Structures are given as structure tokens and as C-alpha cells.
């Protein structure tokens, strides 16, 4: 067996120790998340060019400029230096990251989908689309990787927070020497806010007792309004405003997604009214279309009868439209669906009726998410800020969820509690008219997940297949992105996030 010579081994260990010491010395260095807006802003400016020349922005917090000692004997003759204040540069863009939940490659209509997504499509027609943007196969890892620019294992988020363990890389506890986008931008002069789903804090740290060191405000978002876990009841959510649990209105028309959009709009307006020269960063993450699929009936009615043809026909229709739009090569072959997914024509009439209803509610939920996202985008346009706002619209944090198993669930919790009646067809048909209402907590049959992940085979959780890890992305920035509706097939990953950066810079 080959053995490393003693001297070489000693030198290797010295180098390793040296690297460890270097890492320790730089524990407060922020992760350079490879987002285009960081490069474009050149990390900002401050009061006066003379100060800027003395500022080192490779380490955060930014240290103030050095001033020579004031030796004037008479204080009346002494001249005070200018007040140091870290500011983003003039015309630095606002930044908005939109991340939907549990929807895959065949979701938006711009990517061949059969569900209406007008806001995504509008941005796509005016911006740059990516058809090879990759996420991880699960919620928490994707979100942590996106915000830190680290491999999700390096950020201790190897799996979702609910099943975190004490094994290295899987604790669900962000290391103290890993920074987030919120911290990086806030320390460079941005106002920062996060709305909606978080799902990045270990479950034993999300009670009102804390500890709060890995909550959104400590990562460091000035404002947070949302839920900390992987899902919540959209009619009666568990919501936190910053560190405080809040009671939502006792209103039959209340829906969290509408509420979070309104909160984001109000914050943007308030921030701009007080500090119009200060750019902002908003992370907007609806709970849709993660179960429970809760949505008002007015949205469901739009899709009545739209899925009666079944998942096989819908899957093929999405596939053909994808080829027509050019988001997949024209010679692409539709992958075989999993063997466990029955052909639609082999299902009973009862099964077809129930499953079609499940898809109608799912589609309505996605449509609502896109609509509420559009409300936030509209306020940017109304304020004259849209042209200089860099928007990343990420259509899903992984593939579409097949966690509704073969028959779907009227109440997702029946599955987790091993209640067999929860997936019984006759039992669930009792809730046909109520599907999506406050009396249900529903999920859909796995066959629909396969259809909405066309042209791939698998779905969320299957990291070895693109159906789980490839998601549509649109980058929109009218002031700097000149291409309109262009499609890029450059490979990109949620931790790098700067494919074809020359097109943005």
C-alpha cells in the first residue's frame, strides 16, 4: 500500500491547519452569493468619493474610513469629518425574489402548462427565461442554498427542518459563520423584508420561546411576516410578525396569501415614502402550491371541467406545447411515467370525478398565487420602480409534490397519522364540493404531479431526476436586461444564480 512520506504528510497537515485558521479569522466574512445584483451594484457607495476610496467591502460589516487624528488645540477651529453612513450606490436596483412551492417544470403556461399564470408570463415576455435552472429536491435545502449561496449540506440543511438530526450537515441549524442574502444586502444599505413561507429553522427553535438566532429577523431581515414551518392552514394560519405570534382576522373571506401580499405592498410603499433613495430587497414566498390546497371558490370555478380528460392527456398536451414553445428540444421524447401511476382510462368513474376535482383546486391555488404575486409587482409599476427592480421569479423550490399518494387526501394529516379512511375514494367524495375549503386540508393524487412535471418521470423528493430539480426561472430588469422574452439554456443552480451574468451586467 502506498504511504504518504512523513515530510509530505507533515506539510499537508500544516497547510490544513493554516486553512482552518484562515477560516476562523474570516468567520464574519459574508458569503458572496453570486447574485447578479451584487455584481451590478459593485457593493455600493457612501457619502463622498474620498470615503469610498478608503472603504473595504470585502468584509462585512463595512468598516468606516480612517481619519487622521484631530490635533487642533482649540476645539472651535477643529473641523469634523463627514458622517459615515453605508449607502447603496445611486440607482442601485431594488431586488425581489419570488419563490413558489411544490410546482415543477410543466407548471407555468410559458413552459407549456395548462394553468393560467399571467404574471409569470408577462415577466417572461419582457425578461429572460431559463429552462435549465436547478433546485434541490426539497423545500428547506433549496431555500437555504438560495439565501446563502452555499451547498445545502454546508448550510446544515441536508433535509427538511422537520426531520433534522444531529448529524453534520443535517441539523437544520444555519452555522454562525454563514450569512444570508438579507444580511449581505442590509449591511450594504438596503432595506430588507421576507414574506410567506420560511422553512429554514429547526423545529425545536420555532416556538415563541426561541432561541431566535436563526429566525428571519436575525438573518437579517428588517421585516418578516409569514409562517416558519413547511406549510400552514391558509384559512387560519400560524403567522409571525417578526418575533411575535399574531392573530389573523376572524373573517370568512380571509386568506393568508392575500394577507401576505397586502403586507408586502404596504411595507414597500411605507419604505419608499420614508426613504425613497434607499433600495429594498423583498423575498416573497407564497405557501402555494404546497398542501393544503386552500383557495376561494371563485378561483376554482375558473377550472371546472378543465381536467376531465385526465392526467395522461394533460401530460402529453403540456409536453407538445413545451416543444412548440422551444423550452425543450424538438426531438425530446416524453419520459415514461412511473409504473405505479395508473392510466387514466383504467380508473373508475368515481376516481376520475374525484381526481379531476383535485386538479381543479390545485390549478386554482396556483392561479391565485400568481395573481397575488402580480399585485406586488403592480405596486412597483405604480410607484415607477419596476424598471429598476431586479426580479427573480422562481417557479418552484422543487418538483410538483406527489405526497398526496395514489388517491390524494381530503386531509393531509390523515396520511401522517396512518388513518386509512383519509385516502378512501367514497369517503373523500363526500367532500367533493368542499374540496379546498376551510373544512378540508387537501392534497391531490400523485398522477397529477407527474403530469405537471412533464416531460420528466419523477416528482418532488427524487433528486436523481429532473422532474424533482428543474424549475422555470424568469429574470426581469427592464433598465438593464434588453432582451425581451429570450430563452437561455445555460445551466444554473440555486446556489450560483448568475448564469450568463454578462447579460445582466
Regions found by a protein language model. Give the residues of each.
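Bacterial N-terminal signal peptides that target proteins for export
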Residues: 5, 9, 13-34
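Intrinsic disorder/low-complexity segments
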Residues: 9, 22-23, 35-37, 51, ...
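Bacterial N-terminal signal peptides
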Residues: 32-42
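Formylglycine-dependent sulfatase
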Residues: 42, 50-505
Amino acid at each position: 500500500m502506498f504511504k504518504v512520506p512523513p515530510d509530505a504528510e507533515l506539510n499537508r497537515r500544516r497547510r490544513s491547519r493554516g486553512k482552518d485558521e484562515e477560516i476562523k479569522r474570516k468567520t464574519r466574512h459574508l458569503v458572496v452569493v453570486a447574485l447578479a445584483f451584487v455584481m451590478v451594484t459593485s457593493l455600493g457607495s457612501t457619502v463622498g468619493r474620498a470615503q469610498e476610496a478608503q472603504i473595504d467591502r470585502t468584509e462585512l460589516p463595512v468598516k468606516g474610513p480612517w481619519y487622521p487624528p484631530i490635533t487642533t488645540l482649540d476645539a472651535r477651529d477643529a473641523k469634523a469629518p463627514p458622517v459615515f453612513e453605508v449607502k447603496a450606490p445611486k440607482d442601485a436596483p431594488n431586488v425581489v425574489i419570488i419563490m413558489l412551492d411544490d410546482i415543477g417544470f410543466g407548471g407555468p403556461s410559458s413552459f407549456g402548462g395548462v394553468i393560467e399564470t399571467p404574471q409569470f408570463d408577462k415577466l417572461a415576455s419582457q425578461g429572460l427565461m431559463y429552462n435549465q435552472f436547478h433546485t434541490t429536491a426539497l423545500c428547506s435545502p433549496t431555500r437555504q442554498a438560495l439565501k446563502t449561496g452555499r451547498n445545502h449540506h454546508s448550510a446544515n440543511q441536508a433535509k427538511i427542518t422537520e426531520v433534522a438530526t444531529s448529524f453534520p450537515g443535517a441539523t437544520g441549524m444555519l452555522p454562525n459563520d454563514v450569512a444570508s442574502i438579507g444580511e449581505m444586502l442590509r449591511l450594504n444599505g438596503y432595506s430588507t423584508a421576507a414574506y410567506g413561507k420560511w422553512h429554514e429553522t429547526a423545529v425545536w427553535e420555532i416556538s415563541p420561546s426561541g432561541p431566535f438566532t436563526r429566525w428571519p429577523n436575525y438573518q437579517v431581515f428588517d421585516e418578516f411576516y409569514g409562517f416558519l414551518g413547511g406549510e400552514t392552514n391558509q384559512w387560519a394560519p400560524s403567522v409571525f410578525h417578526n418575533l411575535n405570534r399574531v392573530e389573523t382576522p376572524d373573517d370568512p373571506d380571509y386568506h393568508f396569501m392575500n394577507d401576505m401580499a397586502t403586507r408586502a405592498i404596504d411595507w414597500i410603499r411605507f419604505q419608499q415614502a420614508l426613504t425613497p433613495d434607499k433600495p429594498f430587497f423583498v423575498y416573497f414566498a407564497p405557501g402555494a402550491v404546497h398542501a393544503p390546497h386552500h383557495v376561494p371558490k371563485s378561483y376554482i370555478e375558473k377550472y371546472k371541467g378543465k381536467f376531465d380528460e385526465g392526467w395522461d392527456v394533460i401530460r402529453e398536451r403540456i409536453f407538445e406545447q413545451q416543444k412548440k414553445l422551444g423550452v425543450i428540444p424538438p426531438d425530446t421524447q416524453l419520459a415514461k411515467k412511473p409504473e405505479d401511476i395508473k392510466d387514466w382510462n383504467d380508473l373508475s368513474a368515481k376516481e376520475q370525478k374525484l381526481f379531476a376535482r383535485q386538479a381543479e383546486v390545485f390549478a386554482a391555488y396556483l392561479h391565485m398565487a400568481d395573481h397575488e404575486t402580480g399585485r406586488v409587482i403592480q405596486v412597483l409599476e405604480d410607484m415607477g420602480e419596476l424598471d429598476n427592480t431586479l426580479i427573480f421569479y422562481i417557479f418552484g423550490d422543487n418538483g410538483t409534490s406527489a405526497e398526496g399518494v395514489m388517491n390524494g387526501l381530503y386531509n393531509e394529516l390523515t396520511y401522517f397519522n396512518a388513518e386509512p379512511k383519509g385516502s378512501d375514494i367514497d369517503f373523500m367524495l363526500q367532500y367533493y364540493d368542499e374540496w379546498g375549503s376551510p373544512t378540508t386540508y387537501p392534497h391531490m393524487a400523485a398522477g397529477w404531479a407527474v403530469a405537471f412535471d412533464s416531460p420528466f418521470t419523477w416528482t418532488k423528493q427524487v433528486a436523481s431526476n429532473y422532474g424533482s430539480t428543474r424549475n422555470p426561472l424568469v429574470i426581469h430588469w427592464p433598465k438593464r436586461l434588453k432582451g425581451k422574452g429570450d430563452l437561455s439554456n445555460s445551466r444554473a443552480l440555486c446556489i450560483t444564480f448568475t448564469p450568463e451574468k454578462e447579460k445582466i451586467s
